[in-house]
Amino acid sequence: MKKFITFFILLSSLFLKAQTANEPIKIETSIQKISETEYNLIFTATLFKGWYLYSQYNPDEASLPLEITILEGESGYKLVGKADEQDTFKKYSETWEKEEIVFKDKAIITQRIQLTNKDISEIRLNFFGQVCETACI
């Protein structure tokens, strides 16, 4: 039985390692109430070692920037400006020959929204971003 448990633990750790390569970012969300109609949506992204996420403020004609948009067909709320980003770094891209803005290890991104319908019970957004190590996904 002990050998089976050891094998199962080893097999589980191999599965987790494989999952890490396919999903190098984990995003948690929280909400901060500002007023009766305004809220901050806080995205806390944890990136696996060696991976980075591009900022929404990347220069034109460079890597794909982060985008937060309302899902098509959704209503009752709107985005207020661009999201606020914390803990970004500048990184020179040999490919684009430009300095780009990225997150390493952790990203905290805060998007303010305004309710246009106070009875709304769910907020659904697209969080589109490019994560890279030696290749991008």
Positions of PLM-derived features:
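Bacterial Sec-dependent N-terminal signal peptides
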Residues: 1-23
